[in-house]
Structures are given as structure tokens and as C-alpha cells.
A protein has these predicted regions:
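Sec-dependent bacterial lipoprotein signal peptides
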Residues: 1-21
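N-terminal export/targeting and maturation segments
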Residues: 22-72
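Short, solvent-exposed recognition patches
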Residues: 56-112, 117-120
Length: 120
């Protein structure tokens, strides 16, 4: 193989590794999910209206997720772990447990009242 082909192959492998390592996945640990739910319920009590929560005020269970943004809305708590042009990836805890987040095809229930959302 020529040196330029070796370089091209190496760059392709490095690009693939970078892209796959950037993909985030939700936790499935029930204890951690329960802590996220409890922390989110506290934030909803403290912020009945829409609010972006400053990093210094994130509860420990949420801060451990290393999110980019935490916001409280009329529908619940959004914990954005990776921003993207159409919303990104993250966790969502609804204000009403039986209220399914919309659009349905972007959300996956991961447990303990926590949903995971992702781009289309």
C-alpha cells in the first residue's frame, strides 16, 4: 500500500473512532435513574416556571451526568448531555409521570420515570 493510502486508511479509522466515541448512551442503572428522578423533582419544586439552571445549582445526581445544559420547563426537566442542531441527546423527567414526551419517536423510557431523547 502506498504511503498516501496508508494515511487515508489511518484517518478513516481515527474519524470512525472519534464519531463513535462522541455518541452518548443513557445509564440503565436503577439507583442512578432514581437519583436523577428525585433531583429533577426537586428542581421542578424550586422552579415552577421555565428556567435554565446554573451549573453551580445542579443537584449532584444530575451533575454526575456532566450535562451541557439543565432546564426546567412546563413539561419537565431536560438534561442535555450533548447538544445538537435539533436538540441533541439527554435525559427528560416529566412533571406528570404518565405524560408521555413528544414526539414519541425521539424518546425512550430508560426507567424510574426517566426518558432518554436523541436526534431524529
Amino acid at each position: 500500500m502506498s504511503p498516501s493510502r496508508n494515511l487515508t486508511a489511518a484517518l478513516a479509522v481515527l474519524t470512525a473512532l472519534a464519531l463513535t466515541s462522541g455518541c452518548t448512551r443513557p445509564t440503565r442503572d436503577p439507583t442512578e435513574l432514581k437519583a436523577i428522578t428525585e433531583a429533577s423533582r426537586l428542581l421542578m419544586k424550586l422552579h415552577p416556571a421555565d428556567a435554565d439552571i446554573p451549573r453551580a445549582r445542579w443537584p449532584r445526581a444530575i451533575a454526575r451526568l456532566e450535562p451541557e445544559l439543565v432546564s426546567v420547563t412546563s413539561s419537565g426537566v431536560h438534561i442535555t448531555t450533548k447538544a445538537y442542531f435539533d436538540g441533541g441527546w439527554g435525559y427528560f423527567v416529566p412533571r406528570r409521570e404518565r405524560a408521555l414526551p413528544e414526539p414519541v419517536d425521539r424518546f425512550e423510557k430508560v426507567g424510574q420515570g426517566v426518558y432518554w431523547w436523541h436526534p431524529y
